[in-house]
Amino acid sequence: MKFLKSNPFLALANNYMIDAPEPSNISYFWNFGSLLACVLVVQIVTGILLACFYVASMDLAFASVERIGRDVNYGFLLRALHANGASFFFIFLYLHIGRGLYYGSYRAPRTMTWNIGVIIFLLTIITAFLGYCLPANQMSFWGATVITNLLSAVPFIGDDLVQLLWGGFSVSNPTLNRFFSLHYLMPFVIAALSIMHLIALHTNGSSNPLGVTANMDRLPMNPYFLIKDLITIFIFLLAINYMVFYNPYGFMEPDCALPADPLKTPMSIVPEWYLLPYYAILRAIPNFQLGVVAMLLSILVLLLLPLLDFSAIRGNQFNPMGKFFFWCFVADFCILAWIGGSHPENVFITIGAYATAFYFIYFFILIPVYTILGNTLIDLGLPRSNK
């Protein structure tokens, strides 16, 4: 242990992972950070190995991906781990964000930690989309065509931006080269931001379910919380092994098994399941430009939460109104995911429009309203309690 504290590099790891003081009452909802770190390592390692065999060419990309699964030693394992690892990464990411929303982890003094996390979330979405396009299958080709066309919503220079991104007049070899290069780079950027996220977190320490400062009641990270983290990591390993060996393509669309055909449009163009809520928001607004703005705002609104929530009580643990509306928001988010994966028929478009409206009403109206109402009730109750 003395060596861990005397060596400057090991001392840094010791301060963050072994001797770090953590609130004694944090629950398993605080384990998603370690799970995300574990999955990120898996994604980087498998991604580097897959890149050794991938060919960024419209003619050979699909064949190279199939060859990885058929001819490369343990290639099927690498491919399944990488594909399903992305899904697990988003599962843990959404749960991590949901825990932060529920317990008010975006409130001061952890606003910087929250903002870095939102940037990581946005970059993760971009990285996932880039990787989704690389196999050059039927769904990814048309998904790349549709999503990259969103840049045409930029006034005056939109069409030029699309052609610059494509490297031509359609999704082709230059497009795959650009996407492959960026997809290889982005995980390392996310890893660097994750370290910044960790540094910002340890500046003021972790929050806790009670939402109060707990500087006097803390325990060292090792062994108490490391053992706790290992439990959820082992559960994750069991889950991803089940998906890899028993249902490796469970999260994929059937059209992902077909090579790209520029002359034939799929019956329904949908992104991966973890991007469906934002795709539903895009489709819910008839105006193209406003739909793109709404989709982007639905992510960036998380940066405004520290300003929108000024409640005297941190989090929803002791806030009945906040708790009720939070679970309404969770249900609304699930409805958006369902609508995003459905055919764009009138009934689904209508439901998506109402769900999209509630999504923004929750952030811009409900949170400030029940915050003001809650603060007012607290102010009215304080004189009575003092008496």
Curated annotation (Swiss-Prot):
Residues holding heme b b566: H96, H197
Residues the record lists as binding a ubiquinone: H202
Binding site for heme b b562: H82, H183
GO cellular component, one term: mitochondrial inner membrane
Subcellular locations according to the entry: Mitochondrion inner membrane
GO biological process: mitochondrial electron transport, ubiquinol to cytochrome c
UniProt cross-references to SUPFAM superfamilies, sorted A to Z: a domain/subunit of cytochrome bc1 complex (Ubiquinol-cytochrome c reductase) (SSF81648), Transmembrane di-heme cytochromes (SSF81342)
Record note on cofactor: Binds 2 heme b groups non-covalently.
GO MF, any single term: metal ion binding
Assembly and interaction partners: Fungal cytochrome b-c1 complex contains 10 subunits; 3 respiratory subunits, 2 core proteins and 5 low-molecular weight proteins. Cytochrome b-c1 complex is a homodimer.
Family, as annotated: Belongs to the cytochrome b family.
Role, per record: Component of the ubiquinol-cytochrome c reductase complex (complex III or cytochrome b-c1 complex) that is part of the mitochondrial respiratory chain. The b-c1 complex mediates electron transfer from ubiquinol to cytochrome c. Contributes to the generation of a proton gradient across the mitochondrial membrane that is then used for ATP synthesis.
PANTHER family, alphabetized: CYTOCHROME B
Name of the featured protein: Cytochrome b
Organism: Schizosaccharomyces octosporus (Fission yeast)
Lineage: Eukaryota, Fungi, Dikarya, Ascomycota, Taphrinomycotina
